[in-house]
C-alpha cells in the first residue's frame, strides 16, 4: 500500500468503512418503517448477543480508535441486518407488534450460555392466557373451544425443575442390587448327586435280588452296614425297581418284534422250464415213425405222425421197372428204403421248428 495520500488503494480504512456505513444507512431507513413493537426485542437481542466489554477491549480502545471504530461499524451493520431480517419475517408471517414469548431476562441468560433455573421460563398455558394470545389468535376466539380453558390450568404446564427427581430412580435401582443378591442366596439349591462306592452298590444289588421291598428296620440295618442313611437306601430301592420294570418291558417288546418279523418261510424259487425234445434215434436205430418220445412226467405237444408209406405209394406213380417180371418185391423194398430215408432227413431238418 502506498503512503502517498494522492494514490489510495481499495484496502484503506476509509474504503472499507464507507460501504458498511452506506449499508447501515439503508437498513436504518428500513427500520424506521418497521412495526414499533419490534424495536425493543431486537435491540435487546443485539445487546445480549454482543460480548460484554472487558479490560482487553478497553485497552484496545485506548490504544487505537480506528480498530474499535471498525468493530463498532461491523456490529452496527450486523444489528441492522438482523433487524431487517426480523422485519421481513414479521411482514411474512403477519406477526403483531409487542408479541413476546419469553421474558428478556431468561432469554439473555440462555444466549449467554447460562440457562440457570428452568422455572424462569413460563408455562405454555400462562402465555396462552396472557395478552400475547390475543395478539396471536385474535380477540374473539371461537365459542366452540371455550370449554377447553378449564383443562389448561397451571397443572398442565411441564415442571422442568422437578425433573431432577429422576435421579432418585437410579439410586433406588442401585439400592436394590444387594436385595437381589440376598434373594438369590436364600433360594433353595439342589443338592449335589451322591455317588455310591462299588462295595455299596454291590451290597445293595445283592440285597435287592433277595428282597425287593424292605421294611423300616431292615432299611436301617442295611444303611448302618454300608454307611448310608435309610433315606438313601429307600430311594435306591425305588429307582432300581423302576429300572428293572422298564428293562423287562423293553425286553418283552423286543421279543414280540422279533417273533413278528420272522413270519412264514419264503416259497422256493421256481424250477427251470422244461421243453419237450423229439427222439429221432432210439437204441441206436432211427425211429421209423419219427414220433418224439417225451420224458416221463412231461406234457408237451405231440408232432403229427407222417403219412404211411403205402398211402404215399398209391398216390405217387411207381417207376416202370417195378412192373417188370421178377422185380416186384425187391423194387418195393428199395423204394420203401429211399422214402423212409427222405422222411428221416425231413425230420432232422424241421424237427425243432415248433
Swiss-Prot record:
Keywords: Developmental protein, DNA-binding, Homeobox, Nucleus. Residues 246-329 are annotated as: Disordered. Residues 189-248 bind DNA. InterPro entries: HD (IPR001356), HD_metazoa (IPR020479), Homeobox_CS (IPR017970), Homeobox_NK-like (IPR050394), Homeodomain-like_sf (IPR009057). Gene3D superfamilies: Homeodomain-like (1.10.10.60). It is found in: Nucleus. The keyword DNA-binding applies. It comes from the Eukaryota. Residues 263-272 have a biased composition (Pro residues). One of its GO terms (biological process) is regulation of transcription by RNA polymerase II. Pfam families: Homeodomain. GO terms for cellular component: chromatin; nucleus. The keyword DNA-binding applies. One of its GO terms (molecular function) is DNA-binding transcription factor activity, RNA polymerase II-specific. Belongs to the NK-2 homeobox family. PANTHER family: HOMEOBOX PROTEIN NKX (PTHR24340), HOMEOBOX PROTEIN NKX-2.4 (PTHR24340:SF40). Probable transcription factor. This is Homeobox protein Nkx-2.4. It comes from Homo sapiens.
Amino acid at each position: 500500500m502506498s503512503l502517498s495520500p494522492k494514490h489510495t488503494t481499495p484496502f484503506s480504512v476509509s474504503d472499507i468503512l464507507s460501504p458498511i456505513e452506506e449499508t447501515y444507512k439503508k437498513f436504518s431507513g428500513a427500520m424506521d418503517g418497521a412495526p414499533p413493537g419490534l424495536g425493543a426485542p431486537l435491540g435487546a437481542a443485539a445487546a445480549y448477543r454482543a460480548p460484554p466489554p472487558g479490560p482487553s477491549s478497553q485497552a484496545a480502545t485506548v490504544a487505537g480508535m480506528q480498530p474499535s471504530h471498525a468493530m463498532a461499524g461491523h456490529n452496527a451493520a450486523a444489528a441492522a441486518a438482523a433487524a431487517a431480517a426480523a422485519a421481513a419475517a414479521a411482514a411474512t408471517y403477519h406477526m403483531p407488534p409487542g408479541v413476546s414469548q419469553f421474558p428478556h431476562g431468561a432469554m439473555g441468560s440462555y444466549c449467554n450460555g447460562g440457562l440457570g433455573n428452568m422455572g424462569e421460563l413460563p408455562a405454555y398455558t400462562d402465555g396462552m392466557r396472557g395478552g400475547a394470545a390475543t395478539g396471536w389468535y385474535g380477540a374473539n376466539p371461537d365459542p366452540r373451544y371455550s370449554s377447553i380453558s378449564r383443562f389448561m390450568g397451571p397443572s398442565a404446564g411441564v415442571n422442568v425443575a422437578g425433573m431432577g427427581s429422576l435421579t432418585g430412580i437410579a439410586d433406588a435401582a442401585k439400592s436394590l442390587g444387594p436385595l437381589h443378591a440376598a434373594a438369590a442366596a436364600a433360594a433353595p439349591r439342589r443338592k449335589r448327586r451322591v455317588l455310591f462306592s462299588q462295595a455299596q452298590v454291590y451290597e445293595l444289588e445283592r440285597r435287592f435280588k433277595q428282597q425287593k421291598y424292605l421294611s423300616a428296620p431292615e432299611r436301617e440295618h442295611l444303611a448302618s452296614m454300608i454307611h448310608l442313611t435309610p433315606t438313601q437306601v429307600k430311594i435306591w430301592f425305588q429307582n432300581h425297581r423302576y429300572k428293572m420294570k422298564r428293562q423287562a418291558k423293553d425286553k418283552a417288546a423286543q421279543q414280540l418284534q422279533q417273533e413278528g418279523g420272522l413270519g412264514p418261510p419264503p416259497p422256493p424259487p421256481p424250477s427251470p422250464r422244461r421243453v419237450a425234445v423229439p427222439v429221432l434215434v432210439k437204441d441206436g436205430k432211427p425211429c421209423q415213425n419219427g414220433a418224439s418220445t417225451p420224458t416221463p412226467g412231461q406234457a408237451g405237444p405231440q408232432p403229427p405222425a407222417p403219412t404211411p408209406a403205402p398211402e404215399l405209394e398209391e398216390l405217387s406213380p411207381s417207376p416202370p421197372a417195378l412192373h417188370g417180371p421178377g422185380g416186384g418185391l425187391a423194387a418195393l423194398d428199395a423204394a420203401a428204403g429211399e422214402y423212409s430215408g427222405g422222411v428221416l432227413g425231413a425230420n432232422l431238418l424241421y424237427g425243432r421248428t415248433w
